Amino acid sequence: VRAASCEIWVPTQAPEAAQQEAARLLGIPAESVQVNITMLGGGFGRRLQVDYVLEAVEIGKAAGKPVQVLWTRDDDMKHGFFHAAKIEHLRAGLDAAGKPVAWLHKSCGPDLSVLGLPSEEDRKNPNFYSDDGMPWGLFDNPYNFAHQAGDFVPVQSPVPTGPWRAVMYPSTVFARESFVDEIAHASSVDPLELRLRLLEPGDVLDLKIAKVDRARLIAVLRLAAAKSGWPALLKQDAGRLWGRGVACNIYAEDCYLAQVAEVSVSKDLTDLRVHRIVSAVDCGLALNPLGIEGQTESAIAWGMSAALGGKINFKNAQAQERSYADFKVLRMDRAPKVETYLLQGSDMPGGFGETAVPTVAPAIANAIFSATGKRVRRLPISFS
């Protein structure tokens, strides 16, 4: 930091914001702030925030010399921005023959203001949430119900929340795909078969700001089912209960994915193992198939970490977890076999960094029900 300029070296996903906020803090023009972007490491949306940049700028200004600011893991766990907690409420109506004909999905939680959205102008528009399609996973519900409605109720959180890998999709897709399974059970229909029926006639759903190609979702569902061996029974043994679950989603209009999870649960419900996750993918023209496989594997590890142990506890307004010793993430000895199958499309290539995250939790939860008859309606998964 100099009298009339500033140079920053930083791993950031938002260099423009870093430049503008540093300039505002120092009272100098934005063009007098040079931001050099280093290798990012794991960003996952956290580095869209620039709080750590401003900390370095303030210290550098006070010190009057170049400084390097490093956060410990403890700092990172306690002073980061957390994935927003949400509540999802769903209802469905069946006709006399057991066919689903009505759907209601209400979602409640912090909105995208964590990204600087919506703008002040958008906030004055009473139709903003429907017109701009928030939250994801609710407004772009692919299933074909004769009558359906969705609503999003934004609330302020006392906890600082921020972007998370797949942003708003995970909670809404977990609720939606779990509830479709509940409808299947109530209708005495195979969960995969019900999804295929609800996606007929395989048309394109035009939502004005996005389009959902149901035929592409049908294709990945059928591929995932075929590669996983659905609906053949899994092996059973004396001490464990085995089950298989399915979930699917469209990510940001241009990526279609279906997953089948295979799990086993000890009969005393104290030990859950995820043995295999099969993914079928259509993200248009796949320019880097190996990259898609790698992103699928990392997304599954991310989704499993969140589904099985991703929890922050607060006491006196302070996060209690301080390291990976008490914040549990997936370990290698618990990692499942991952299989990724690609449908090579001709559409424009779609981004795939987050696509495989939202379906992991519902696929596992639905597999748990298949094995034990117990529904999972809360994350992280717990039998207590």
Where are these regions (language model features)?
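Cofactor-binding beta-sheet edge motifs in enzyme active sites
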Residues: 1-384
